[in-house]
């Protein structure tokens, strides 16, 4: 079984699972995570995520995801309905079915500024709630944002999520490469919630451009693309960066900052927010509470959120104590 991260508390006792009562229809997703199957129960449709198992039992990724999802309760976070088991022993996590993910939606539609703000506000609200629980998602990307037919967004895939610790030491190399913050690209294992903010900046930019802005095939190429858009990485733009292992290992190019000009061509109102999210220095990167409170949302998205009772980020006092996290499952 893969090891837990330093300071991470995981309960390895058996999960409560009910008998499989869902009719499988077809596979709708497949990858390193396993399979996602469209299923039916009565007239309702569901998504069944097959749980990965190892010789010693359930993987740490699966245990972590179930624990975290059972602690969640927010309209912008996918709901884990139950865990079911088949007679042969296969285990599935049951979720509501969503017809789209944001990645496919972006590539199939020319999104309006109103749609972008509406969707992104919901994502930011969800991340605000996640962070209020003392959790970093660590895999925010457009493919992990699910959409219903009314463009209501739900954040999914919490296999890489984990609770923050007092030591602040975590596994390096997390987050899908194209959405990975520069501090992780440079080998930091002492990162913060700011890594999720960088990913949010990538998602918002992606919605405007119609494609992901940084598409490196290796960490070095990814860094070069980040530098080309966000400027040179040095002690002026990122104090302390020379202490990171990757800064010594890579010969980084020099470049002026261009990201503001790129976004201004699509929506001038988004320039300031994108600039603050895609800040090279994680200590100066905007917080998710500040994202939610940004003037970027003053007109369309905030009006929509207010009608749904989601005005502002109202979850800051909802962090779990360390003692409660031990029994989060």
From Swiss-Prot:
EC code: 2.7.11.23
SMART domains per the UniProt record, alphabetical: S_TKc
Active site: 139
CDD domains: STKc_CDK9_like
Highest taxon listed in the record's lineage: Eukaryota
Gene3D superfamilies: Phosphorylase Kinase, domain 1 (3.30.200.20), Transferase(Phosphotransferase) domain 1 (1.10.510.10)
Protein's cellular compartments: Nucleus, Nucleolus
List of residues binding ATP: 28-36, 49
One cellular component term from this protein's GO annotations in UniProt: nucleolus
InterPro entries: CDK (IPR050108), Kinase-like_dom_sf (IPR011009), Prot_kinase_dom (IPR000719), Protein_kinase_ATP_BS (IPR017441), Ser/Thr_kinase_AS (IPR008271)
GO biological process, one term: mRNA processing
GO MF annotation: an example: ATP binding
Keywords (A to Z) from UniProt: ATP-binding, Kinase, mRNA processing, Nucleotide-binding, Nucleus, Serine/threonine-protein kinase, Transcription, Transferase
Record keyword Isomerase present: no
Protein kinase domain segment(s): 22-297
EC class name: transferase
Positions of disulphide bridges: none
Functional note: Catalytic subunit of the CTDK-I complex, which hyperphosphorylates the C-terminal heptapeptide repeat domain (CTD) of the largest RNA polymerase II subunit. Involved in RNA polymerase II transcriptional elongation and pre-mRNA 3'-end processing.
Family of the protein in this entry: Belongs to the protein kinase superfamily. CMGC Ser/Thr protein kinase family. CDC2/CDKX subfamily.
Summary of subunit composition and partner proteins: Component of the CTDK-I complex.
Stated name of the protein: Probable CTD kinase subunit alpha homolog
Organism listed in the record: Encephalitozoon cuniculi (strain GB-M1)
């Amino acid at each position: 079984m893969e090891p837990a991260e330093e300071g991470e508390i995981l309960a390895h006792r058996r999960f409560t699972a009910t008998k499989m009562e869902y009719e499988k229809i077809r596979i709708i997703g497949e990858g390193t995570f396993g399979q996602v199957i469209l299923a039916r129960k009565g007239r309702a449709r569901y998504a069944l995520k097959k749980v990965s198992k190892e010789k010693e039992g359930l993987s740490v990724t699966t245990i972590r995801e179930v624990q975290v999802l059972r602690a969640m309760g927010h309209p912008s976070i996918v709901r884990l309905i139950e865990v079911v088991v088949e007679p042969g022993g296969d285990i599935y996590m049951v979720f509501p079915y969503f017809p789209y993910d944001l990645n496919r939606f972006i590539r199939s539609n020319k999104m309006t500024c109103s749609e972008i703000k509406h969707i992104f506000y919901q994502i930011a609200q969800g991340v605000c709630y996640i962070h209020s629980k003392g959790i970093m998602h660590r895999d925010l990307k457009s493919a992990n944002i699910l959409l219903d037919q009314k463009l209501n967004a739900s954040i999914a895939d919490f296999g890489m999520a984990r609770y923050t610790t007092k030591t602040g030491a975590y596994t390096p190399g997390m987050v899908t490469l194209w959405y990975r913050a520069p501090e992780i690209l440079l080998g930091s294992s002492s990162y913060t919630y700011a890594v999720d903010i960088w990913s949010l900046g990538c998602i918002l930019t992606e919605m405007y451009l119609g494609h992901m802005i940084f598409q490196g095939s290796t960490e070095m190429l990814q860094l070069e693309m980040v530098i080309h858009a966000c400027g040179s990485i040095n002690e002026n733009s990122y104090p302390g960066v020379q202490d990171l292992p990757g800064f010594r290992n890579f010969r980084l190019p020099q470049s002026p900052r261009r990201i503001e000009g790129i976004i201004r061509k699509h929506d001038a109102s988004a320039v300031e927010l994108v600039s603050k999210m895609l800040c090279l220095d994680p200590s100066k990167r905007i917080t998710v509470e500040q994202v939610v409170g940004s003037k970027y949302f003053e007109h369309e998205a905030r009006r929509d959120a207010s009608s749904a009772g989601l005005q502002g980020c109202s979850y800051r006092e909802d962090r779990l104590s360390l003692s409660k996290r031990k029994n989060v499952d």
